[in-house]
Amino acid sequence: MRKDVMMISAGLMMMAMASCNQTEYREITEDRVVSQPVDTIKVADHFYLDGYLSRTSEDIGGRQLNAVNLFSDGEELYVANFAGKCIDVFDAETLGLKRSMSNGDRTLARDVYAEGDHLFVAAGDSREVQIFKKKTGKYLSRLGTGSWPASNVSWAGCVCATPRLVFVRDSKETNIRVFDRNAINLGAANNNNVYAKLATDSYFIGSKFEPQSESYDMEAIGDSLYSFIPRTGTIYSWKVQDIIEKKNDAPAKITQNATEKIRSISKTDDKEKFFVSMEKDGKMQLAEYTLADIQKRNFSQPTRSFASDSRVSLPSQTIVTYQKEKLILTNGTKLDRWEIRNNPSYEIQPRKK
């Protein structure tokens, strides 16, 4: 019996020793991350106009409203109210009326432009450009009231300004008068020293084909001054530095386009993009273009565009200004505002293996 036990114990020890010399195999289960083909999603934007809002005579206390031009500085909207003989100032976001400014009955406003602390008003038949303090509405002085033809502005139909210069579009004399802001004395009743006259040859307004009752636009874009003649599709531009250095002899770039006729242009939050109101193939459109498009006069491929449809009616001679994805338009006896909205679509594109 004892011998059997000893033999069993010896056998177990030998088995244990043998097992230590063998390789042990185990199946181990663990989480593994395996690369899989991933689909990509293509987003196609679909921008449209909605959220319509208007302002009429009732919103300015029952006074006459004839909005012929406008300008937004991002905080306030300045509206040239020709019938009301004033500039009406609205909150740019809410379009609530804040104040009005005028120089008696002489503010026959055809255009308005804000630059720095001042507001410049092209006063049409008053044959002058009026200067106001932008925040208070205080009248300060006027430009272009001297003797004809040296400094008198025969018809102040349009105005634009940079930190250095003021540009006045004189349709009767078919030129643009330029005033040097550094030489303007805001304490004087009149400032009549003309810095330069930019000739426009026979293309410019003043003929029977360009009625002075219509609204026109000028804008400083990039390094140049642009002036638009919508009936003929003519665009003038001058390098601002050329105007400063060469004055009357500053060369103009003149182009004409019979199918794409810009009436007005507005800066946006992006200094490389602009919104225009234009007639394209006989229909009114609001369209967004890049600075490069404008410089090249390439209006065939806007980044965004909106035309009249069953919901949206665009005035035929509208001036447009951009305000934080909203477009504000002149429309005769009222202001129109449309919000730009987006309803994107998504296209799944499987990745190629």
Predicted features, each with a name:
Residues 79-84, 121-127, 168-172, 227-231, ...:
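Conserved beta-strand positions in repeat-built beta-propeller and related beta-rich domains
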Residues 65-69, 107-113, 152-159, 196-205, ...:
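Repeated scaffold domains used in trafficking and secretory/extracellular systems
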